[in-house]
Amino acid sequence: MTMYAKNNTAGKDMLSLLEWNKEELTDIIKLAVAMKTNPAHYSHILSGKILGMIFDKPSTRTRVSFEAGILQLGGQAIVMSSKELQIGRGEPIKDTAHVMSEYIDAIMIRTFSHEKVEELAYHAEIPIINGLTDLHHPCQALADLMTIYEWKDQLEGVKLAYIGDGNNVCHSLLLAGAMVGLDIRLAMPKGYEVDETILATAENLAKESGAKIFVTVDPKHAVADADFIYTDVWTSMGQEEENAKRLADFGEKYQVNAELASVAKPDYHFLHCLPAHREEEVTAEIIDGNHSVIYQQAGNRLHAQKALLAAILEAK
């Protein structure tokens, strides 16, 4: 009867997207669109469910969207930082995972080490959601796919150019795109490439889905005829000491500006996961212009994560 019961996804983790298949991801996106269109219909489906949220990194979009999302579905959230928990004083992750599994229904964690999230998931008896690690940002990728789907009514064959650092956002975008059949072009300077293992995994996924993956150091080559142009900050949290070098290494060549965007399709859309540094990775003219859909994209974090929560928490 309900879309969220289509696949047996109850209890699944969301660590890197690789726990899910193409059909399951597509169902999440379609459910997210349905929830956005008719939120009242889903307002009680997670009644009685509790989401624990652990933050080791500052957050605006992840915290507010997850907390609002579980509330809008009838559940509740408990927000914590590692400093407030015994894990911050040396308690083993194993013990924390088992104990929290006795109290709540799922954990969303935003932290630095991806291995920490994997260890938490290994020991927990409840679903674990990666709210961001240094290696992956799967929930952002869900919102990205949703935004693309809303504009194109499809995912297969859509041309997406990512310009900038081969970081966690890029990793998840690459994996998601490879799973659903996007035409992905990556442009980044030497020394800032995506993780080799993740690229190899994406290339294998692309063989199954029909996705295309192209990597270059030439931004104009990547952006040529693109439907979407995506970028992210050149200096992420924890890399502040590298900022001067990074600004020099990326420079104007990798900035998304009017000149670069001119080779994309005339009706292209601009994406950015935020927060943004205007006049660094993107000009104000582009990010605040008519082609930009960054606020729709940010808003879709809410809807995509609501769909994810419904899928893993056995929605009523």
UniProtKB/Swiss-Prot annotation:
Keyword Cell membrane attributed: no
Catalytic activity: carbamoyl phosphate + L-ornithine = L-citrulline + phosphate + H(+)
Localization per record: Cytoplasm
Keyword presence, Transferase: yes
Positions annotated to bind carbamoyl phosphate: 59-62, 86, 110, 137-140, 273-274, 301
Gene3D superfamilies found in the cross-reference section: Aspartate/ornithine carbamoyltransferase (3.40.50.1370)
Keywords: Arginine metabolism, Cytoplasm, Transferase
Taxonomy, superkingdom: Bacteria
Positions that bind L-ornithine: 168, 232, 236-237
Entry's Gene Ontology cellular component terms: cytoplasm
Pfam family name, one: OTCace
Pathway(s) this gene product operates in, as recorded in its UniProt entry: Amino-acid degradation; L-arginine degradation via ADI pathway; carbamoyl phosphate from L-arginine: step 2/2
GO MF annotation, one: ornithine carbamoyltransferase activity
GO biological process: arginine biosynthetic process via ornithine; arginine catabolic process to ornithine; citrulline biosynthetic process
Entry EC number(s): 2.1.3.3
Group of enzyme by EC: transferase
Main localization category: cytoplasm
InterPro entries: Asp/Orn_carbamoyltranf_P-bd, Asp/Orn_carbamoylTrfase, Asp/Orn_carbamoylTrfase_sf, Asp_carbamoyltransf_Asp/Orn-bd, Orn/put_carbamltrans, OTCase_ArgI
Family: Belongs to the aspartate/ornithine carbamoyltransferase superfamily. OTCase family.
Chain's role: Reversibly catalyzes the transfer of the carbamoyl group from carbamoyl phosphate (CP) to the N(epsilon) atom of ornithine (ORN) to produce L-citrulline.
PANTHER family the UniProt entry points to: ORNITHINE CARBAMOYLTRANSFERASE, MITOCHONDRIAL, ORNITHINE TRANSCARBAMYLASE, MITOCHONDRIAL
Protein name, entry field: Ornithine carbamoyltransferase
The encoding gene: arcB
